[in-house]
């Protein structure tokens, strides 16, 4: 029996273009007092990163596979295929790297191997939606002699920041370590430089604050004014807004605001409703605020953007956008006043009206959500940083 442990050195969340580092430890768990005949051997081990794509058949109409391209996937269980047994199709993969060959371990002995690979920058982000799913995994394949391959899969979460594809790593002193007493290899320099550049771009895009005001009205007049200080956010930030109802001519009885994502299938891949398809647009609510606001002059709300959510993106098949979805309940009666008189000549019981004629309407405000630091996003990652398998 051999135990294989894969541990990600920095957590399971990465930015596309960063270098993933994983330590693979192979151990013979028998006690050292066992006989030498209890030694274990592995023929080889290899590692590869791949992205698996899966689409809902009721929502997405994918083109049929090209019959001129034969299926070259072998049926043999002795061939290393990282996506073997996975749902969907592999749309992106890195070249496989061999970790070791002809490894023999005595009882109680263990050996560790380091795997490093740059995550492809041209791929989609990790996403589990109602129409499509993009799932990244690091797969480690191990094989005994004359035995099938055993696969160890480590789930990953990949964040994509648009605009880094065209950035070139400078080959000069601009990327030198901040301390002259520290030495970094070329890969470490590039990885830290890319993370620093991404942080600077995210800070520049999300730190600009300027008050934006929107007049809210229905067909009968002005309801109020909505104010928001910015429209670009990072994962983990709060969307803060204010609502001024004191200037409205139409009484607002209640309002709600929801932080939502809109997943939309591209027109060329939408399945027709008559062919058993479902709507090509789906919405997910991540946070919601509701308030009864009759006689309220000014109010505010704060909606947190979950660290575990996916920033907005667009591929050839699907797009994901963020928005604030407002719903207002207004009175049909002009000048609605439901306050008791200031002076009461005698004891009086005051009750609200049993029925109020109302109208409802909604409004959507698009916002932009960008990734955040992979280290910060790791706190919300559902997957562990260590995976184990026994052969």
UniProtKB/Swiss-Prot annotation:
Pfam families associated with the record: Rgp1
Example GO BP: positive regulation of GTPase activity
Entry-linked InterPro entries: Rgp1
Compartment list: Cytoplasm, Cytosol; Membrane
Keywords: Cytoplasm, Guanine-nucleotide releasing factor, Membrane
MF terms in GO: guanyl-nucleotide exchange factor activity; small GTPase binding
Keyword Endoplasmic reticulum found: no
A GO cellular component annotation in the UniProt record: membrane
Primary location recorded for the protein, binned into one broad class: cytoplasm
Superkingdom, natural source: Eukaryota
Biological role stated in the UniProt entry: The RIC1-RGP1 complex acts as a guanine nucleotide exchange factor (GEF), which activates RAB6A by exchanging bound GDP for free GTP and may thereby required for efficient fusion of endosome-derived vesicles with the Golgi compartment. The RIC1-RGP1 complex participates in the recycling of mannose-6-phosphate receptors.
Family: Belongs to the RGP1 family.
Assembly and binders: Forms a complex with RIC1; the interaction enhances RAB6A GTPase activity. Interacts with RIC1. Interacts with RAB6A; the interaction is direct with a preference for RAB6A-GDP. Interacts with RAB33B.
The protein, known as: RAB6A-GEF complex partner protein 2
């Amino acid at each position: 029996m051999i135990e294989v442990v894969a541990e990600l050195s920095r957590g399971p969340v990465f930015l596309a273009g960063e270098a993933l580092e994983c330590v693979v430890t192979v151990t013979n768990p028998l006690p050292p007092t066992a006989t030498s005949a209890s030694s274990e051997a592995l023929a080889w081990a290899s590692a590869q990163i791949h992205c698996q794509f899966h689409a809902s058949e009721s929502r997405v109409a994918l083109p049929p596979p090209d019959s001129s391209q034969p299926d070259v996937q072998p049926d043999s269980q002795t061939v290393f295929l990282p996506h073997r047994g996975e749902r969907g199709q592999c749309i992106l993969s890195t070249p496989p790297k061999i970790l070791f060959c002809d490894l023999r371990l005595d009882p109680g002995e263990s050996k560790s191997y380091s795997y490093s690979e740059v995550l492809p920058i041209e791929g989609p982000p990790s996403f589990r939606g109602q129409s499509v799913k993009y799932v990244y995994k690091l797969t480690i394949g191990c094989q005994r002699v004359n035995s099938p391959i055993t696969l160890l899969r480590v789930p990953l979460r990949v964040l994509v920041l648009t605009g880094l594809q065209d950035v070139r790593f400078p080959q000069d002193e601009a990327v030198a370590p901040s301390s002259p007493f520290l030495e970094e290899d070329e890969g470490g320099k590039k990885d830290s430089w890319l993370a620093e550049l991404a942080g600077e771009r995210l800070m520049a895009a999300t730190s600009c604050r300027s008050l934006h005001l929107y007049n809210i009205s229905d067909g009968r007049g002005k309801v109020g004014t909505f104010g928001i200080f910015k429209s670009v956010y990072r994962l983990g930030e709060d969307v803060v807004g204010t609502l001024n109802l004191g200037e409205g001519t139409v009484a607002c009885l209640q309002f709600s605001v929801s932080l939502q994502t809109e997943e939309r299938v591209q027109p060329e891949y939408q399945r027709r409703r008559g062919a058993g398809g479902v709507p090509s647009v789906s919405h997910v609510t991540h946070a919601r605020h509701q308030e009864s606001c009759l006689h309220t002059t000014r109010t505010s709300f704060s909606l947190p953007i979950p660290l575990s959510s996916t920033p907005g993106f667009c591929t050839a098949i699907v797009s994901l956008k963020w928005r604030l979805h407002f719903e207002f309940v207004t009175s049909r009666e002009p000048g609605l006043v439901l306050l008791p008189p200031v002076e009461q000549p005698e004891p009086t019981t005051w009750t609200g009206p049993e029925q109020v004629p109302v109208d409802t309407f909604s409004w959507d405000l698009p916002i932009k959500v960008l990734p955040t630091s992979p280290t910060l996003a790791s706190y919300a990652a559902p997957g562990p940083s260590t995976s184990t398998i026994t052969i």
